[in-house]
């Protein structure tokens, strides 16, 4: 009986320790929630949108490079999954240059968001990490990003301008599905454009592919109703099925020699 009681006390103590440890991994500073991700690092994990009647509703969120909790300083290095989702009234989000990664769905489906200032040091964007922000107007992708992942900018219908760095290598499936830009220039460092990457972009009229692009996968530019001009480089090797399906305004495309 004594052994059973001792074991019970040990388990209870362990559970209590675990609970306290879990509580300590997340904290809030100035309405912004953070999750500890390393010994000295945190990720932005949410926004407290519960306001007292006397408080002013946030319209801009400016993330600091460091935050303090329980007497310890942490560097903000990431934006976690669903950190900013379904917000209302937030017009601008600005990230510090200490942030290197946006996780999947990090800044997703925000009704009023018009501007995102990305860290210059971001190297990784997650799937859907900047998707469905329908009022987002423009964005510059930092030089350290080498891959545009699946559905990263999908349904950003208000996006009129996007600037690529000169050294990224691929655009993922559905990356710009239903995005709003009218023209796009893809540098030659990008070797592969994924399935349905630009499908149903309603305003897209002109596409310039830099010398070096090698593969357009299935449905890459399908159902772009206003597309009238696309330049295919001599470096192109493969065009997938339905790459230009139902591009009703595209009267002709010059296919480079050797394309399969």
Could you tell me what each predicted segment is?
Residues 1-4:
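Positively charged n-region of N-terminal signal peptides that target proteins for export
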Residues 39, 55-78, 88-101, 111-124, ...:
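Structural signature of tandem-repeat unit edges
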Residues 80-83, 103-108, 126-129, 149-152, ...:
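Consensus positions within tandem repeat domains that build extended binding/scaffold surfaces
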Residues 6-15:
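Bacterial N-terminal signal peptides
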Residues 17-22:
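Sec/Tat signal peptide C-region and signal peptidase I cleavage site
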